[in-house]
Amino acid sequence: MNETVRIEGKQIALRPITLEDTPLIVRWRSDPRVYGTLFRQEPITEERHRQWLREMVLSGKCIVDKAQNRPVGTVFLKEIDREHLRAEYAIFIGEETARGRGIGSEAARLMTDYGFQQLGLNRIYLYVFASNVRAITSYRSAGFREEGRLRENYRCKDGNFADVLMMSILR
């Protein structure tokens, strides 16, 4: 993905993630309400974020709320497979005030459109905790369909196991 590409939507824009976003993203990823929905369930340090950023900068975008002109989350296409024309989708909304407003669904539509139209992908898939109803609703709204349930696939910090859903959208 071209890191200079900016994608415009109705209420959001997707712009490249920069090193200047580090303090904000570290704050988001250190919030238990955010990292509790991710597969890495622990706060993140600035150094770990910089390592993550180096790995994700080519495929990640910062979600910007156009009304307030401020970042509210991040979205990615990762594990891009050029042979089989597929990629994994990932997102988190870091700002509490941005949740429940359809921003996640719009970001998903913008990113999947980009993946299909610009990258030539055929399939975009994701993994989500089966208990994350808000995210599942957002993904369905964006056109993702459930493909299966991975029972007790993830061991949580509290020692309990969680089911994970696999969802995808096709071109």
Protein language model regions, located:
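A short, well-structured alpha-helix characteristic of acyl/acetyltransferase catalytic modules
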Residues: 1-50
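Conserved GNAT acetyl-CoA-binding A-motif
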Residues: 117-127
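Short glycine/proline-centered loop/turn elements that form peptide/ligand docking sites
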Residues: 104, 108, 131-135, 152-157
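Conserved catalytic-core motifs of GNAT/GCN5-like acyltransferases
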Residues: 125-128, 145-162
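Conserved acetyl-CoA-binding loop-helix of GNAT-fold acetyltransferases
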Residues: 100-114, 136-141
